[in-house]
């Protein structure tokens, strides 16, 4: 099974070399693809050095900060074009433990089309989070799942493994969201297509080095888009119901 790991980066100079080393130890044959948004702290240069030293690493240098969704769209398209079997996405700041990846790959081999590293299934959780952040994240995920009608407990986790054919089938290159709303948009598409989504427990550890990319603007954007998608979904359901009843009355 050929695995590719897509790693969006922006100012992760304190983390990138150590993460690439750990990934190479956990997944000796995987292809590692770094998508760097012209990090001022030299993240891209460090990734290039690792590529020369370790092999099996590609680095895409983008001209500026273009967002998480954009980075994943470009990264997914690149690795899918290489004919890989599984695509893994994850954060670079060690919030996501590379040692969990084998369990995610095992779930893919067992028949899942997508596997989410989940904070909100039995055995999962968070570490070093203040209470307000835990409550906000939990509420946000409950709201997202309820509004969008998806049976996923952690819609916003970026730690995932996708069967490459399943990922390609939902056309991620046509998604519109940026920021963390992009992750929810993928969950919606997977669910609407009837693909099998499973969740494995993870302990999400707050970053020790670097600066978080999360902001109030990103959270607001995510909630607004989720609400918009939910309204559109309910409207389409209502229209379908009316159309069915109309046909029944005519028959």
Task: State the predicted function of each range.
Residues 21-30:
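Short, acidic, metal-binding catalytic loop of nucleotide-sugar glycosyltransferases
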Residues 29-39, 60-61:
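Short beta-strand/loop segment that forms part of the nucleotide-sugar
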Residues 36-45, 94:
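A conserved acidic beta->alpha catalytic loop
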Residues 58, 62-81, 98-180, 207-222:
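Acceptor/aglycone-binding surface of glycosyltransferases and processive sugar-polymer synthases
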Residues 84-93:
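Short beta-strand-to-loop acidic/aromatic patch adjacent to the donor-nucleotide binding site
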């Amino acid at each position: 099974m050929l695995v590719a790991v897509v790693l969006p980066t922006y100012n992760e100079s304190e983390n990138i070399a150590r993460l690439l080393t750990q990934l190479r130890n956990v997944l000796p044959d995987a292809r590692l693809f770094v998508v760097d948004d012209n990090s001022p702290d030299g993240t891209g240069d460090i990734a290039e050095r690792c590529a020369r030293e370790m092999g099996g690493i590609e680095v895409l240098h983008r001209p500026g900060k273009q967002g998480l969704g954009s980075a994943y769209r470009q990264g997914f398209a690149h690795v899918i074009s290489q004919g890989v079997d599984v695509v893994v996405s994850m954060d670079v700041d060690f919030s996501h433990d590379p040692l969990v990846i084998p369990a995610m790959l095992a779930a893919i081999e067992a028949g899942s089309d997508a596997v989410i590293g989940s904070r909100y299934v039995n055995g999962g959780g968070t570490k070093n989070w203040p209470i307000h952040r835990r409550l906000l994240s939990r509420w946000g995920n409950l709201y997202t799942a309820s509004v969008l009608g998806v049976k996923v407990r952690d819609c916003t986790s970026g730690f995932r493994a996708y069967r490459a054919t399943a990922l390609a089938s939902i056309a991620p290159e046509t998604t519109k969201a940026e920021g963390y709303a992009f992750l929810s948009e993928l969950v919606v598409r997977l669910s609407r297509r009837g693909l099998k989504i499973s969740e494995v427990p993870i302990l999400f550890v707050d970053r020790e080095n670097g600066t978080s990319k999360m902001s109030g603007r990103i959270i607001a954007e995510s909630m607004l888009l989720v609400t918009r998608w939910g309204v559109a979904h309910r409207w389409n359901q209502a229209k379908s119901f009316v159309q069915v009843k109309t046909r029944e009355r005519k028959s």
